[in-house]
Amino acid sequence: CNMRCRYCFYADEMKRREVAISPRMSDVLLDVTVRRVIRSADSAVHFLFQGGEPTLIGLPFFERLVQLEQKYNTRALRITNAVQTNGYDLSDEMIAFFAKEHFLVGVSLDGTAQTHDLMRPDAAGRPTASVVRKTIERLREAGVSVNVLCVVNGEVARRPSEVFDALAPYEYIQFIPCLDGLDGQTRDYSLSGEAYLAFLKETFDRYHLAYTEGRPVSIRHLNNWIAM
């Protein structure tokens, strides 16, 4: 990955492996995977690529993926593709490809610039919020369907209204709680159950207000709870 998020459990796992990073997926394995998944499906297929940072595998990998989907989709199934990216280094060519092939792209942005940069520096320790925000705008300008994923840690939970205001313009948002590691140690960014509940309550109030004012924002788990 080209970022070093403070809460990343993959980074800790890499340090403990004999081989830090496994070899990239071979073309043969990609071919077999796509073929078997499509042949086993009844009506629809969804491929999702996520971190580390999946875009680092390069554009040719995704181009080959789409070629294989077209080759093996002899029953005209509905096939969708999605990528979860940190949004730090997407080329114009990759963005154009995602638009052309109708990829759904999730971008990680932890609320405000302050809360994001506190937790999500690049590999050299530099802030990344401004670059990520620019990437989101580039994706949207290209016509790519985008949603924003925000990790709720202790710092984010203390600023629910600021975080909502920062993310609401992107319209489609997901929140996931930042859990402590299995070692049981708490950290300066740890999220308590009480803090998460308070965050969700105020976020719901803002979500409801935006809806009543004709400015609806989609927050996936709130949508799901309401639909239950």
PLM regions: where:
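A short, flexible beta-alpha/helix-coil linker loop
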Residues: D12-R16, Q114, D180-D183
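Active-site neighborhood of divalent metal-dependent phosphoester/pyrophosphate hydrolases
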Residues: G52-E53
